[in-house]
Amino acid sequence: VYDPVTVDKPETDYGGKREKDNNDENPWQLVEDALKLVEDQVTEDDIQSFCSDGKTIDCVYIVYAGLGQNDGGNGTTVWANCSTTGGKTLRGKEVRWYTMSGELSPEIKDEHGTTIKPEGVNGLGVICHEFSHSLGLPDMYPTAKSAYLNNQEMEYWDLMDGGEYTH
């Protein structure tokens, strides 16, 4: 775990400029910018412990400020995600995977407008979900409306479905 860094670009450069669009435009640039900023904090001993083969870092995890688009942020924010880095490096070592998620979870209100849970620090659910992708686990939530037939999905019982949002 390293000290927070502040990137020079606005969030829209990474999440997107189209507020009603759920597609991130450039999360890889956030990874590259964050790696450059944290590089001075990373020691040679750290690099050795990160590199199981001596050449590559398997995965880095980035927690970005604010809400993620997946958790109440608007369309210009970054959606929590996991992907390959496309050859990004940290202190001369290639980083294979990145995972990222937002720092905050949203306020939740009931049907009467009463706050059930105030906005606060995000729980481990989304972190565990996204990191599990870097280990090879797939999403278990339905990706087609027809898959919601008779409420048969795993929902909150599975970390790779809605369980990531149980706080």
Regions found by a protein language model. Name each.
Residues 1-153, 157, 161-166:
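Active-site-proximal segment of zinc-dependent metalloprotease catalytic domains
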